[in-house]
Amino acid sequence: MNKSQNSGIVEQFVNTVMGVKPGNKSQSLNTSIATTQELDIKAVLVYTLGTILQILVMILVLLGMEKLVMFIDNSSFPSWVSTLLAGLFFALLSIRSRIFSLLDNTRSRQTYDQVIRPRWSPPPLAFPIVWMTIAVLRVIYSVLIWQQMNHQFLVLPLILFVVHLALGDTWNTIFTVERRLGAAVPVVILGPWLSAVVVTAIYWQTNSIAGMTLSFSCVWLTVAAVLVFRIWQLNGSEPLYPLKLTLVDR
C-alpha cells in the first residue's frame, strides 16, 4: 500500500468520524446569489431562533443526563458506569452537537475547496483532523469538570460549553452551508471564538487542567478566525451581514 493510498484511507476515516462530506469541484457552490446590499432579516431571525432552540434542547438533555446519572449512582451499578456514560455523552456532544440543531449543519469541504484562500491556509484535511483532536480533548475536560461538579450536568461551565457548541454550529451554517463570507467574519469572532475564551476562563477557575486542555481550541479558533477574515478579503469583501439572496438557475 503506497503513501497516497494510506493518506486516502486516513482522510476517509477522519471525514467519516467527523461527518465531513468531500467537496465536489464540478458542483455549483449554491443556487442563490446576492443581488442587493439589503439585510436578510429573515436569515438573522432564523439563525438567532435556531441557535436559541439548540441551546435550550441541549440544556434539557443535560438535565436528562443528570437525572439518569443520579439514578445510576444511587443504584447498585459499579462506579465506573456513570463515568463511562458521561464520557460517551460528551463524545456525542463534541462530535455531533449539530444533531440538536434545526439549522442545516451539513459538514462539507465544498465551500473551503472553491473559495480563494491565502497561501498559508491549511489543507482541507487538516480541519477534520484538528477538530477530531479537539473533540477528544473536549471529552477529557468535560468529564473532569463533571467530576469536579459532583456528577452534575446542569452547571454553569457545562451550560456555557453547550452554548459554545451551538454558536459553532450556527457559524457552520452561515459559512459552510450558505457561504455567507461576510456574515461569517463577525459571527466567528463573537460566536465560537469569544465563547471559547469565556468557557476556557470558567473551566480554568473550576479545574486548571481542564482549562489548560481547552486553551488549545482557543489557539485553533484564533487561526480559524484570521483565516475566515482573509478568505472574506480575498473573495470580494461583501458586507459583514447576511445579504438577501435570490434563487438563480445554474
PLM feature spans:
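Aromatic-rich, lipid-facing transmembrane alpha helices and their immediate juxtamembrane interface loops
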Residues: 2-250
